[in-house]
Amino acid sequence: MKIKVKLFEGGKMPQINEKGDLFDVFARTKVILNAPQAGVQHQVNLEKVRDVVFSNKLIPIGFAMEIPAGFKANLLPRSSTYKKWGIIFGNHVGQIDSSYCGDNDEWMVNAIALR
């Protein structure tokens, strides 16, 4: 099966890790995410509790791919993603189907910083 891949400026081709069967993808640009502040006090009377606001950003991963009809791709974090980068995926699993295949349909990761 052949799959068309379009690289965007600064993007890298998905790479198969020599120890596994999955593709690794890489951020195309530097993205700064602000993590919520630690030290929120929780008391029974709730007077000193404040909301913790999490921000998310879409991180471009540098390519578009033409998925064949009837197939889909899943973007999943590696088990080391949080340890290395302090982020989680906002939607936990990014699912991309064959309809997302236009020239400007760059794949992105919805990321939330926790630290």
Predicted segments with their positions:
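DUTPase catalytic domain/fold
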Residues: 1-115
